[in-house]
Amino acid sequence: MFEQVLDAVRAHDRIIIHRHFRPDGDAIGSQTGLKYLIKANFPDKEVYSVGDDPARYGFIDGCAVDAVSDDMYKGALAIILDCGGASLISDTRYSLAKTTVRLDHHLFTGQIADTEVIRPEYESCCGMVTALAMEAGFTLDKTAAKALFTGMVTDSGRFRYDTTSTDTFMRAAYLMQAGFSTDEVYLPLYEEELGRVQLRAHFIGKIRLTEHNVAYIYTDRAEMMQLGADDFTVSRGMANVMSDIKGVSIWVNFTETEAGVLCELRSSRHNINPVAVKYGGGGHAKASGATVADRETAMRMLNDLDKMSNGAEI
């Protein structure tokens, strides 16, 4: 499945790895994991990672981005990971590269790279990179293995979401052969300061329901300023405080930012991706996102989700 990707890696002396902006564990994990796999198995190659600040995933060993000049893209291979659309790629200079490759597990919305491997059935992009390593018979680097395991954990919801398969656990077992402790992953991911627990309690108190049981939270700029929390912590970080509510199969978290209203859509049963796509976003069948211009547009999205919850097709 990955032979064309491996051929591209073998054919280039310099490789620059991209992922989506506002990175999550899967984006950082797949980027870091692939970087260190290539470095371990092709020691003569130059391998760099680029993008915005890894933020809360800075605990992942080796995740720091590199300083890469425009000239370094000449003759290089750019690999794009965990990006469902070109507008999501952090650092658009991938287009300067001689050759481009994309590995992704989001629903396909259009070609970005010269060579693409798109597999929505995978629980994570980290799972895809792990499968590539297994197919190639790579030497498994511990830094790479821990980074990839981290992304598998986060994007599978701790191996809970329905994209988790027997193959997922086989890949996880393969990574654990590198000898890291799962505590090295789970503790920095899920151990929280008291303030974060209190913040989550605050957002639980904000949950509202639509007529047909879509749970939602809306946080405006004034409240964001008052809370002093960053956009990622509130938008993606608080989306799943609405999961596991009896009778609720769709939930959405709206967060006002300088760039617009961040919309994090989730579902336990419905394919909410068409709603995200309708509003310029994308993602997975049961976990998608979009950024809309204002509250009025966000409420139209909420209305569409309410119709979906009542059985309508969007």
Model-predicted segments: where are they?
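Histidine-centered active-site/metal-ligand motif
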Residues: 18-20, 26, 103-106, 284
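Solvent-exposed alpha-helices and their adjacent loops that cap or buttress functional pockets
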Residues: 71-72, 93-95, 109-110, 140-142, ...
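Short alpha-helices
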Residues: 106-171
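Hydrophobic helix-and-loop "lid/oligomerization" segment in the mid-to-C-terminal part
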Residues: 2-18, 29-58, 71-75, 157-314
